[in-house]
């Protein structure tokens, strides 16, 4: 079992007495519907069978002792449940501490500390939501440990709240929602404006989902993410002078074409066009899957990437290379960047008999062009957070 070394590390660092729990929260990938979550549109993410493992034990004092097997050079990072605030030297522990703080803000005070060891098999900085996975995992552990009366959907909202207010990153709800609400074999058709959702089975006969990781490091906080949000807000404010909408996601393509001249900046107009068209693509993509039309789903994935490249301008040479090389290969049904962009990953649907050639050819072309290697993961769609032991 993947978690056994994590439990062994916990016992080595913190001893084996008391009630020790073993937990898992997945990572996520978004199949289509990118940069729509803060524009009141739809998304189509799913939880993965890779994610974050946590071993935790409640303490009878206020002390927090955190250790990550992914950042062993940092050693055990100690703090307290009293006076929680973000600190640069706290590094990755700002994510679990932020969730503890957020529980307190929502009227559920974490009264005692804990010992925690984490191990993630999500590639770090890949855009598969390692931070949101840690947030949902922390919330799930706190619920189990302290008996807080919260649903999995609440855990998603608390995770997002902590990332926004404690860590100062303007993320939407998708990452935490997909992780907290994951269901094996299904993606989540999520209306980000209302949080209404439905599960849609992903039936890929003779095909696999392949994640290609660019290995270009990026952080949400220092990317152009916030800039894109404000460009969309500017476009929305100008559109609202001529048409009654709450969000860009309220518009159809035809309505956008009718009213787009209200947006004075050509750049903001392009950003808004992506938000509107991507939302409509996502709705069509889910319909395509329901009709078992995987080929149409793949075409919409490809169109999504073109829009993210040309109208939203969040791809960059690394992601474009991965996708454009994928498009050349027989047996690739669809390929696009996924996540915030500027590095991170692509998601591709690849026929079973083409997977090996895909990894070899895309990998070689990428290394030749970018000068360092990409990593490839053939992934399965998994469930949300779980207590393993």
Which sequence ranges carry the predicted segments?
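C-terminal nucleotide
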Residues: 1-28, 53-89, 186-334, 349-389
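Gly/Ser-rich oxyanion-binding loop with an adjacent helix/lid
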Residues: 1-23, 29-33, 39-42, 73, ...
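N-terminal cofactor/phosphate-binding cores enriched in small/glycine residues
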Residues: 33-35, 47-48
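Short Gly/aromatic-enriched secondary-structure transition segments
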Residues: 40-47, 228-229
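Short, charge-rich binding segments
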Residues: 45-47, 55-58, 107-108
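Extracellular structured ligand-interaction cores
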Residues: 51-53, 113
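FabD-like malonyl-/acyl-CoA
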Residues: 132-133, 345-349
